Amino acid sequence: MEKKKVVVAFSGGLDTSFTVMYLAKEKGYEVYAACANTGGFSTEQLKDNEKHAYELGAKEYVTLDVTKEYYDKSLRYMIFGNVLRNGTYPISVSSERIFQAMAIARYAKAIGADAIAHGSTGAGNDQVRFDMTFLVMAPGIEIITLTRDMALTRQFEVDYLNEHGFKADFKKLKYSYNVGLWGTSICGGEILDSTQGLPEEAYLKQITKNGSEVIEIEFEKGEIAAVNGKKFADKVAAIQEIESIAAPYGIGRDMHVGDTIIGIKGRVGFEAAAPMLIIAAHKFLEKFTLSKWQQYWKDQVSNWYGMFLHESQYLEPVMRDIEAMLESSQRNVTGKVTMELRPWSFSTVGVDSPCDLVKTKFGEYGEMQKGWTSEDAKGFIKVTSTPLRVYYTAHKDEGEQLEKEL
């Protein structure tokens, strides 16, 4: 009889390490450990993952690199939309989960797996993101979640691994981190107390730069084309370059409070230097290059795009429609943005764009008009005031009351 073939979405953390060993030893399954990398793992970490997977009893280990797919199919649209959840959080690691899950589902189908296992608990968002993706993309394949379904404690998992000869250090730290291409989330410690913020030592990237520094980010049709004059065909590398320049200033640190998919409130700290800088630069450039109504409608659909990403609705067909609108909106978002960086903050300096709508033959704001006469201006103002004049003529009592209040 053939052994049951199970793919474990393997991060190298405690829950997925326990899952690999338990399924191999206790269940006798044929375990395939698959690490879906969306840009958060270093080469050294991936090597450690492979070594540990085999020590835990996996038959095979594979790294599925979906960093480019993550950028091409979602991250670029998040930049187009200047997506910040609740106006604060760049949907860092959570936006990567869907692409990790899709990669795992494809791999499971490719090897003919009977089941997919992941290490999510029953208290967070990731269980929804993984399970929903597997149900849609790998129908008929069983989903196994030992940590959730067996209500396992961290100590139980550590003890089990130690008893079976796996001695990695899973000591509970004060903080837990999820590191990704689009930022790092921080949980635990002071975050559990709504009255407190995070101390300096909680951040992985410490402040090592003083003074100020100018950075130039060049966009072409909404995508990063160059950083400080250096051209980038690889957009992921451009993001990493900006991160290396801005993170030592402590830029992009904040606290996000929001609603989880399962309905409870959640609080998370984060550090996201490159995302916050890129979004600010991109949004600044759009103010010069988009029409008023392009900006307005793009803001509306961008909020929906970010919410759907967070809520595990990336596969919803309307997302492709929103992406089409976002991409269309970027056809004139080309130019160079200059910003000044300093410890804990940054500011926009200026824009140089061939599509600059501020510098036109019609005039400059607050200066001399060139595209109309003074009589044109007076006529425009009179016509614009018509709805208000009509209303208060019909409702004189409200007009009189308004005069008294003002």
Predicted features along the sequence, with ranges:
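Nucleotide-activated chemistry modules centered on ATP-dependent adenylation/adenylyltransferase
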Residues: E2-L406
